[in-house]
Amino acid sequence: MRILIVGAGAAGITAGHALSEKRIDFEILEASSVHGGRVKKTAGFADFPIDLGAEWVHRAIKAKAPTTQALLSGQSPEFRIFNYRPKTILQYKNGKLRSKRWMKLLLALVNDGKFADSTWFDFIDQLVTPEMKKKIHYSTPVIKIEHSSNEIVATSASGEQFRADKVLITVPIKMLQDEYIEFAPALPDWKKKAINKEQFGDGLKVFIEFSEKFYPDVVEIGSAIRNPLESDDSYYDATVGKNSSKNILALFAHGPTATKYTSLKTDKALLDFILKELDEVFDGQATRYYKKHIIQNWSKEPFIGGSYSMRKGSVKELSAPLNNKIYFAGEAMNPSGKTIAVHGACESAYLAVSEMLTNKDRR
């Protein structure tokens, strides 16, 4: 059996790892020049590595991928996780800063963690063995998948063709909604309906270094009472729990509230907007103490186009395989409903691989 994996994000890399363990032939076709997808890091901005993409370890999402079990249970010798417990949480609304003590209780209940001295990218990257890396074709965006015969043919933007018995699609759902990949024959109506019903929000992260710390551990702009899966914009001290001597404030925005940031035309316009917003909250101190910044605008990232899914569609239909030939995995495609989290994406890859090898069609 020969398998093609489209996408080298968390799900694609995990699927490759699972197939390697079973000694099954596969290739990974990755559109960008690097693997990781929405799992990305920068090591040179601060005195600790920074997650430019997925950052939190959402323990409340009980996805059980074999690769993440030791990590989630705190038994991984290579990757230390600490409990994320910010001490000062404020909300800025109608020109006033207010303490939000109840949010501390909520965060304790959610029990999120963060990497102490590494990142989600480091965790995914350690699965990419030298043998696997030889199987990854970088800068190879797939634009067409033909599946009318027993053999599947995937065609890249450059015209190169790859052949296999089965294909696993792990691209962000935004790419399927935009029909970046042509399927021949076309996807059935029920699959297209499920894909288009899902929402994929805008999203970005910005990290700013200041010469002085003038901000709390977390500050929410506007209403703090909303579904964080659907919309959020929060500034947070990125050094909480880290061994750092720097003053790094981060902005994470996703969903409808992120559009005011992601829609700005230039990075300068975005920085000016953020500093003005912070100056209003903190009496001009953001501009006064600004040193440098780094921006990761996921809405403008090629082959991604946003943050993550909003759980609006039918996950079971989204992830259901087609004719025992085309399979789906990723953070939006976990049939058990454990979506969004990186370990949810990893679990979806194991479930898809299992279905491939057993020819099980859930629909």
List where the protein language model places each region.
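Beta1/beta-strand and adjacent pyrophosphate-binding region of the FAD-binding site
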Residues: 1-11
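Short hydrophobic core segments
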Residues: 5-6, 29, 162-176
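Conserved flavin/dinucleotide-binding core of flavoenzymes
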Residues: 11-14, 21-22, 43-45, 90-106, ...
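Glycine-rich FAD pyrophosphate-binding loop
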Residues: 20-45
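N-terminal FAD cofactor-binding segment of flavoenzymes
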Residues: 46, 56-87
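Short beta-strand to alpha-helix junction loop
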Residues: 56-66, 107-128, 265-266
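A conserved short coil-to-beta-strand element within the FAD-binding core of flavoproteins
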Residues: 138-152
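Flavin (primarily FAD) binding-site architecture
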Residues: 169-187, 204-207
